[in-house]
């Protein structure tokens, strides 16, 4: 066996055409090719799947059932595999407890740091908490005036389950007469009933004293006895006032604020020892959001200002509101913004104990009369959300609720005691709020004592290394407290990459899926250096990537194609980037050598004279931003990672437009106003989320073509004779579908120690329909055979059916002619799903008042696919007069835009400002813009290429 190569023979996963390929080991290998050409099939479904499967195979059958074994890939032979680690974009944790700090393990090191060198500081008095001497305890008690009655106790059981009989017997032997159990005082000889399954607190009453002169010695002896019995703790109850907790360990000598022994779990918000009890360590509480309940305060109650109580099916709540307003004298025809504070308080929060007469008449004419207090809209929504058994009701109520910072921990997720522990006057929550850059500066300037420095040195080394890795992959703007679920696919992937670098493993096969997604050109070099450093310590990297810089930095480049889907699945070219660039068969090579390129438009559109203006945007890191977007243009928002692009476009603009135009309830990010909405009629967000979550959804159903196809089959003579309607040709309802598999075409067989097996249905043989339905044919094919066609074949087949042909033509236009009409939506990539959505918009008639938003549409797209996508986007603007707004880093897209808005200058707190606006040429001239710096040479290069091409064409 050749130890220098990974040898693959006969790979046939998905669309791979029985290919053989050799991949050099310990090298940076990039796989590229058109979207859908088979890159992921080779990298993830063949190489990674086999590497993972071989590892799982080595485990016992018992262990295998917990791991979910992977299917054996369809391949004849793979040799030279190392243990494989896949870093893709789909495995991001959506757990609200996961943060950047926990995922990268930085938080674990911080917990250790605080447990070893942290100093508890009393939050009430600001003094450092140290262990107290008995003298300090006595002095604290004697501060109370004479004749104050006190009771000295030893807390021997604190919040523990059990009957504690043995403990009480031992107290008896010690000669003590009284004890306090859960706040009640008992004689030691009483029959004390203690429930076994509840938590209890037990204190021995040591002494009862009245403060006066000359009791110092007795007080000293009593406290000493309590400390001895309770392992260094004593409780002094000031009768009729409060209790003081004293500790030989850690407690404030003034107010008794006490911190237990410092240990790492105390600083974890995922542990009951550290988590804030109010929010359970989540940092937020779900509360009803008044602004979502009443989005438009200029409306009156009669005009439906209260959105959740607008009459839909039942009149119950509208009638209740009318009766309450009548009783409490609230005018239902006064706009909400003009109602008195008292009146609005009753409407929102209820009438407390005041009752009103309520007569409710239901739809069946029955009447109910009662006197009840008015619950209030906000408590009503919260109650219905928490108490309902209906998922529908809970989802409806959730629309009006939002996560607000927890009032107890202020969003830091931790207990008050934990947050009292400081290092350099900062608690662990404050350090987690730092960006990666700020954290590096903090640890570099940290001043500790000699002993503490010695203890913390190995911790600092690990923390600095991990922070450095995050900086090197372009994530220095993130904070460690950022929830993992809010990260983009590219950010999450680069975090996992940084974590892997931190592990310093060697001899591993890493498989990465487009790590450059969401990364500005400025940070791309750092990412490439990171990949090369992983290679240099002895790892093999296989990177599925379309970025030109990454391809040119590769040791070995594999181009898979030549086309997509059925037209792909072959190795077109393999070798160094220079060798691939010279290969005449390779489309990638043509783009690398400059034979093919995406041209710069001859002119930039000015728009239709109207514009959309965002005023005073302050969401996340935006610094009171004002931005204008000309309508009827192709505009692009650019800027380094973390500069505020998504905050401006997705958080503020998209949600505000959706709320106004689509009646969506999502609350937009903070902003003053958006002008010019009256010039739009609908907003369409075309993202990369799946077009359907079940295999029953497919491109034909999503674009609406399947409705027309079913109409066509129902209109055939045979179908009319049999009385079949269009519903007969649906695989989702009874009638025409195969009932053995319920229209799925496959049957799932559960295997306990092996992966579930899916077998074709024995009745319909995977065709999804019953025999009678399949008898109906149009132009020689039945409905199942039509669903098996590719879109290109379908277009030819339905060429004389304009309604169907128009819809299929748009799918071909976006470069998806290779997918099958009935291909399950779950098998489409993010880029493919996005283009199916675009196609379904293209065939709709437009009046030029649609606003399209796309967030990084080039994800997963080859330069050739990008060229096709740009033609479609330009068509939406050119033919329909619609507006397209794109968030993008790809310079091929940026150079084609009519108008750019560049945010920056940096990421995180260093961003959130508009650096430059205007045409790409204007941005390229800006000295402050990082985008302009990288755009300028591209514009110059491509203009030269265009001129050369024109000159060559003229000579011919």
Curated annotation (Swiss-Prot):
SUPFAM superfamilies: P-loop containing nucleoside triphosphate hydrolases. InterPro entries: ABC_transporter-like_ATP-bd, ABC_transporter-like_CS, ATP_grasp_subdomain_1, P-loop_NTPase, UvrA, UvrA_DNA-bd, UvrA_inter. Keywords: ATP-binding, Cytoplasm, DNA damage, DNA excision, DNA repair, DNA-binding, Excision nuclease, Metal-binding, Nucleotide-binding, Repeat, SOS response, Zinc, Zinc-finger. It is found in: Cytoplasm. Residues 309-587, 607-936 form the ABC transporter domain. It holds the Pfam family UvrA_inter. A zinc finger (C4-type) spans 252-279, 738-764. One of its GO terms (biological process) is SOS response. One of its GO terms (molecular function) is ATP binding. One of its GO terms (cellular component) is excinuclease repair complex. Forms a heterotetramer with UvrB during the search for lesions. Belongs to the ABC transporter superfamily. UvrA family. The UvrABC repair system catalyzes the recognition and processing of DNA lesions. UvrA is an ATPase and a DNA-binding protein. A damage recognition complex composed of 2 UvrA and 2 UvrB subunits scans DNA for abnormalities. When the presence of a lesion has been verified by UvrB, the UvrA molecules dissociate. This is UvrABC system protein A. The gene is uvrA.
């Amino acid at each position: 066996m050749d130890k220098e190569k990974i040898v693959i023979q006969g790979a046939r996963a998905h669309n791979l055409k029985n290919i053989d390929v050799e991949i050099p080991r310990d090298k940076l290998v990039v796989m590229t090719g058109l979207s859908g050409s088979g890159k992921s099939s080779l990298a993830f479904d063949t190489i990674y799947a086999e590497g993972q499967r071989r590892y799982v195979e080595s485990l016992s059958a018992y262990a295998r059932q917990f791991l979910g074994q992977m299917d054996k890939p369809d391949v004849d032979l793979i040799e030279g595999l190392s243990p494989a680690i896949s870093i893709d974009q789909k495995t991001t944790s959506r757990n609200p407890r996961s943060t950047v700090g926990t995922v990268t393990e930085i938080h674990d090191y911080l917990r250790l740091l605080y447990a070893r060198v942290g100093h508890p500081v009393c939050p009430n008095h600001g003094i450092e908490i140290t262990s107290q001497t008995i003298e300090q305890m006595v002095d604290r008690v004697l501060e109370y005036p004479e004749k104050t009655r006190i009771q000295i106790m030893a807390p021997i059981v604190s919040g523990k389950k059990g009957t504690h009989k043995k403990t009480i017997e031992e107290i008896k032997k010690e000669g003590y007469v009284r004890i306090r159990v859960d706040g009640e005082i008992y004689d030691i000889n009483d029959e004390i009933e203690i429930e076994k399954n509840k938590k209890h607190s037990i204190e021995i009453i040591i002494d009862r004293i009245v403060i006066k002169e000359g009791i110092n010695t007795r007080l000293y002896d009593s406290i000493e006895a309590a400390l001895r019995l309770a392992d260094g703790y004593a409780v002094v109850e000031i009768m009729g006032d409060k209790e003081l907790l004293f500790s030989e360990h850690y407690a404030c000598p003034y107010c008794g604020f006490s911190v237990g022994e410092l240990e790492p779990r105390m600083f974890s918000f995922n542990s009951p020892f550290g988590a804030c009890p109010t929010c359970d360590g989540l940092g937020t509480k779900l509360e009803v959001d008044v602004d979502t309940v009443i989005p438009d305060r200029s409306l009156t109650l009669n005009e439906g200002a209260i959105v959740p109580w607008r009459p839909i099916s039942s009149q119950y709540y509208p009638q209740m509101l009318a009766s309450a307003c009548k009783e409490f004298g609230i005018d239902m025809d006064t706009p909400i913004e003009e109602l008195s504070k008292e009146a609005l308080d009753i409407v929102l929060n209820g009438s407390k104990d005041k009752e009103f007469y309520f007569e409710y008449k239901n739809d069946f004419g029955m009447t109910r009369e009662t006197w009840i207090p008015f619950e209030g809209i906000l408590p009503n929504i919260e109650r219905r959300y928490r108490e309902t058994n209906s998922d529908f009701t809970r989802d409806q109520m959730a629309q009006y609720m939002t996560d607000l910072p927890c009032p107890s921990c202020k969003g830091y997720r931790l207990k008050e005691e934990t947050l009292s522990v400081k290092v350099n006057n900062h608690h662990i929550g404050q350090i987690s709020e730092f960006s990666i850059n700020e954290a590096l500066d903090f640890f570099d300037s940290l001043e500790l004592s000699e002993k503490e420095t010695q203890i913390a040195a190995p911790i600092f080394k690990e923390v600095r290394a991990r922070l450095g890795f995050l900086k090197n992959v372009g994530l220095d703007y993130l904070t460690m407290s950022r929830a993992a679920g809010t990260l983009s696919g590219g950010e999450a992937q680069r975090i996992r990459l940084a974590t892997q670098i931190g592990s310093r493993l060697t001899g591993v096969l890493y498989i990465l899926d487009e790590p450059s997604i969401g990364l500005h050109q400025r940070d791309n070099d750092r990412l490439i250096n990171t990949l090369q450093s992983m290679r240099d310590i002895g790892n093999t990297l296989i990177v599925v990537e379309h970025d030109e810089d990454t391809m040119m930095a590769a040791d070995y480049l594999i181009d898979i194609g030549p086309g997509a889907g059925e037209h792909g699945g072959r190795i077109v070219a393999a070798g160094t980037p220079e060798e691939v660039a010279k290969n005449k068969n390779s489309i990638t090579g043509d783009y690398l050598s400059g034979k093919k390129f995406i041209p710069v438009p001859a002119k930039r559109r000015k728009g239709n004279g109207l514009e959309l203006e965002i005023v005073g945007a302050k969401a996340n890191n935006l610094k009171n931003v004002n931005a204008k977007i000309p309508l009827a243009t192709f505009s692009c928002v650019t800027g380094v990672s973390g500069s505020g692009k998504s905050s401006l476009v997705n958080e503020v603009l998209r949600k505000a437009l959706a709320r106004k135009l689509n009646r969506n309830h999502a609350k937009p990010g903070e902003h003053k106003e958006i002008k010019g909405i009256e010039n739009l009629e609908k907003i369409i967000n075309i993202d990369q989320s799946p077009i359907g979550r079940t295999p029953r959804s497919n491109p034909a159903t999503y674009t609406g073509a399947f409705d027309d196809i079913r109409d066509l089959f129902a209109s055939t003579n045979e179908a009319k004779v049999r009385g079949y309607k269009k519903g007969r040709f649906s695989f989702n309802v009874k009638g025409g579908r195969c009932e053995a598999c319920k229209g799925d075409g496959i049957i799932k067989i559960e295997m306990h120690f092996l992966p579930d097996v899916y077998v074709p249905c024995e009745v319909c043989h995977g065709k999804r329909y019953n025999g009678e339905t399949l008898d109906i044919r149009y132009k020689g094919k039945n409905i199942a055979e039509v669903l098996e066609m590719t879109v290109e074949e379908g277009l030819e087949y339905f060429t004389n059916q304009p309604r169907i042909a128009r819809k299929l033509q748009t799918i071909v236009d976006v470069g998806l002619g290779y997918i099958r009409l009935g291909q399950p939506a779950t098998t489409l990539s993010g880029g493919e799903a996005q283009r199916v959505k675009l196609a379904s918009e293209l065939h709709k008639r437009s009046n030029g008042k649609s606003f399209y938003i796309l967030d990084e549409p080039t994800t997963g797209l080859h330069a050739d696919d990008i060229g096709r996508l740009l033609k479609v986007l330009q068509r939406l603007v050119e033919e329909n007069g619609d507006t397209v707004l794109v968030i993008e880093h790809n310079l091929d897209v940026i150079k084609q835009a009519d108008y750019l808005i560049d945010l920056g200058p940096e990421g995180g707190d260093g961003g959130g400002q508009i650096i430059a606006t205007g045409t790409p040429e204007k941005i390229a001239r800006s000295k402050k813009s990082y985008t302009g710096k990288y755009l300028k040479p591209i514009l110059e290069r491509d203009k030269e290429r265009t001129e050369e091409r024109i000159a060559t064409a003229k000579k011919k």
